[in-house]
Amino acid sequence: MSQQNQVHSQPPAAAPTAFDGVNPCLVEDTALLPTVVDAVVDAGASILERFSPLANRPDGLEAVIAAIHANDEVSVRHLRAPLRRARPTAGWVDDELATGPLPAGEWWVPDVLEGNINHIHGMRDWSVTATLVRDNKPVLTAVHVPLTGETFTAVQGGGAMLDGQRLHPSAKSELKGAFVATGQARPGEDAATFERMGASLTAMLNSVLLARVSVPATTQLAHVAAGQIDAFWQYSDVRSGLLAGALLVAEAGGMVTDTRGRPWSLASEDILAATPALHHDLLNVLATVR
């Protein structure tokens, strides 16, 4: 979001979301979506060939880092070229851990292997994502999960889909029945962030039915959009891990704010994405953590 459109100091009276307004490029963005889907599916296939649930485990930090970089290099070779051809004037964000607002205009913000750490350890929660950001608003995204063949998509103003079927958040309205999730955004967070994570998890465990801690964020946000879990919160402003899922949740009809209830944007320091009927109560839980 541009500098003149920073988040509000107080929560608005209406349902807060960073995705309000008409998308003047809805038709154009919708026409672009199949190209983006093809790109993430192709990149996903290249990474699926490298996946094994049992073999080739890294034996230390250096091996972990090398495996992550090797996977990234394979995926980006399949992802970058078709997206740059489709939108040659759009910028490209290479740094998957980058934070904060982008310069004006259009940018591709991919996560060439979201959940790379899971992939190299033989676990199943990983995907390939690509999101088009226009003037700091996500307007189009595709998230492909190669192990299941599922593809989540969203266009601002056009709804969120899973393989062509429209997504909706859960219908739950009581915290005591809620299934919620959080997770670490990246290695090496500061001590204050770890303390907030721990305190918020304790607060949630005292309020909801079940709380899950897992990575990556995109998978859990997609589950919120699909009504499979009821909320996700994270003390993070890493762009590539949040943009795709935030758009999916918003277009599915969920609430996407920071943990104080202000509209979420790339200027936000944290995120809460939830089914609408639980959002206010979840804010109250997180208000105990500062």
Where are these regions (language model features)?
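An extended, acidic
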Residues: H168-R290
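N-terminal subdomain of lithium-sensitive/metallo-dependent phosphomonoesterases centered on the IMPase/IPPase/PAP
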Residues: M1-L113
